[in-house]
Amino acid sequence: MRHTPPEFGKRVSSGTMVSMLKTTIDLSAIAYNVRLIKEKVGPEVKLMCVVKADAYGHGAAKVVPVMASAGADCFGVATLREAVELRRAGVDSPIVAWIWQTEEILEEALACGIEVAVNSLEQAHQLVKSEIPAEIYVKVETGMHRAGVDEDDWVETFKVLRDAPHIKVLG
């Protein structure tokens, strides 16, 4: 069954490298889609909207507040910098960053409440060493060779995190 969105109103436009091209982002369509998904999954299910890469070029600073008001519970981004930028832009919803390097702005991100995914034993040790309270997820390598804690390090990684009183593993 196809749903017809409501009349569209708010539009955000951004130019591209070629002046003949223009992208028009319909914020009311985005809000409609978020409301529809939330309606379908039910209020007990948390909805994370992934807005990495500036909301895939849609403009995260404009799109995220619309998604939040339409029912998005939290947001996912790739990097700590993206997460901190959203927080600085006034986003107070939970934000999860799942790809980060040990030299990145970890302490700043944790200080402003960014949830992170741990992808390695080294990252687990860095979180413990930071002594900053953190809510985290552990991403495990399951054979796709993308990112995540290697199988050989699973036990030690979970032990390191479990033994740290300032770290809460959410998933």
What kind of feature is each model-predicted range?
Residues H3, S13-M17:
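Short, positively charged and aromatic/hydrophobic N-terminal segments
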Residues G9, L21-T24, A29-Y32, V45-G171:
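Active-site-proximal beta-alpha core segment in soluble small-molecule metabolic enzymes
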